[in-house]
């Protein structure tokens, strides 16, 4: 598979009254065409910042300090707004976090589809709009006759999430980015959304990138997993290898903390300590205050981004020292 998006040394911050939040610090990864990539990490680790920086949709206090995001060889970060508008939604579509709340409660679903089309300069007749919207709603297992003339308050959380996925697919993008697509949903609805995304990926041969704090969700859906900690990318590998042989101590901690119905509770171990403040992150490796393998160098120097065998990448001094996890 070829690379459809290449992220190089992406750095983004938020300017707040207390100082500068260092939310994405030197992120580099390749997204393969027709693949599913999960960006995984604890809450407030910088996951959403990465995709918002990639798509230039950061809030007003967000700043991109450096880096490149190459899509089909062109840097999205240096494009003028009018150039980006030709790509957004038509080629790269984003379903943001807490998207269920982004539907206007005073507008019917069909009006949301109409607004999306008009905002991107697409000229469809009313009958074409109904036909296209109905097609996308059926793709996400919704009945267009019942949903198109409904207001958001008449829909369940899972239905609203599927409406937003249908809206994102309306102009047939080649890349679909979803920020926490299963958060705030009950377990059964989460399972339905995951299954739906699997079907859409297979049907449309689309590239999916999704953010989640739940590594078990990544296991269900992703081909590759990018593990984020404290605004840093600490591991990037195939999903199979991430679970078979986690390279970074943080990745191992995430996997060991997974709760399952049939789990041996004696083997379920939470990661000790708390995530770092991105306002005043620890020196060196940001995970070192919580890491049982921490060495003196971990407190002083940020580890290098190392490529190991195959697809494996890791940022950990253990590998620089020739002492991998066992």
UniProtKB/Swiss-Prot annotation:
Activity regulation text: The C-terminal iron-sulfur cluster may stabilize the structure of the C-terminal loops and may function in the regulation of the transport process.
UniProt family annotation: Belongs to the ABC transporter superfamily.
Domain comment as written in the entry: Contains an N-terminal conserved nucleotide-binding domain and a C-terminal domain bound with a [4Fe-4S] cluster. The C-terminal domain forms a stable loop region and interacts with the N-terminal domain.
Enzyme type, top EC level: translocase
Keyword set includes Iron-sulfur: yes
UniProt topology in membrane: Peripheral membrane protein
MF-aspect GO terms: 4 iron, 4 sulfur cluster binding; ATP binding; ATP hydrolysis activity; metal ion binding
Alphabetical keyword list: 4Fe-4S, ATP-binding, Cell membrane, Iron, Iron-sulfur, Membrane, Metal-binding, Nucleotide-binding, Peptide transport, Protein transport, Translocase, Transport
Biological process annotations from GO: peptide transport; protein transport
Localization: Cell membrane
Keyword match ATP-binding: yes
Descriptive protein name: Dipeptide transport ATP-binding protein DppD
Described purpose of this protein according to its UniProt entry: Part of the ABC transporter Dpp involved in dipeptide transport. Responsible for energy coupling to the transport system.
UniProt-annotated binding residues for ATP: 44-49, 61, 97
Source organism: Caldanaerobacter subterraneus subsp. tengcongensis (strain DSM 15242 / JCM 11007 / NBRC 100824 / MB4)
PANTHER family recorded: MALTOSE ABC TRANSPORTER, ATP-BINDING PROTEIN, OLIGOPEPTIDE/DIPEPTIDE ABC TRANSPORTER, ATPASE SUBUNIT
Reaction it catalyzes: a dipeptide(out) + ATP + H2O = a dipeptide(in) + ADP + phosphate + H(+)
Gene Ontology cellular component terms for the protein in this record: plasma membrane
Residues that hold [4Fe-4S] cluster according to the record: 285, 291, 298, 316
Limits of the ABC transporter domain: 5-255
InterPro entries linked: AAA+_ATPase (IPR003593), ABC_transporter-like_ATP-bd (IPR003439), ABC_transporter-like_CS (IPR017871), Oligopep_ABC_C (IPR013563), P-loop_NTPase (IPR027417)
Top-rank lineage group of the source organism: Bacteria
EC number annotated for this UniProt entry: 7.4.2.9
Disulphide-bridged cysteine pairs: none
